[in-house]
Amino acid sequence: VHGDIKSSNIMVKRTGNAKIIDIGSALALDDMPPNRTCTPSYAAPEVLEGRENTPRSDLASLGYVLIEMLAGKPPFAGLQSYRDLLESKRSLAHRLPQMLPADVTCNELLMNFIRGMIASDPARRFPSAEDADLVKEGAASFHRQLIVGGLASEYDNEIRAWLELLE
């Protein structure tokens, strides 16, 4: 578990491949300390509530980064209270159509992928980074869609690379 995935902890190489940095905060699942620090705006709801930080928590954090990239701004900017932040995370999936550009929201595969990353209930998120990549609504399917549509670019591996780093 990385435990602090956020946009400033993801670096993109010239080749277009993404690298998650600040691995010093990562811990084995069986060696989790009782108190951990995190960046609240990127932490999953269950982490903010003091529950266990799991690989699914990292997926939610990565989903928030993806939304930030697609929207061009952090999804939780300007929130002043813990309660507002938590409520905003819980309602995020329903607010995506208002937050994201139309060319993103019209892509059902991409929207389902995002929702599978950020579901407020961890049990409704992808079970693992591998699943987030390989299942029907996963990153690999979206990548194939880009290739078929002639929309793949030299940076088309970013999402998949992040997921591979979480595996």
Where are the predicted features?
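Terminal C-lobe "cap" of eukaryotic-type protein kinase domains
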Residues: D121-R124, E130-R144
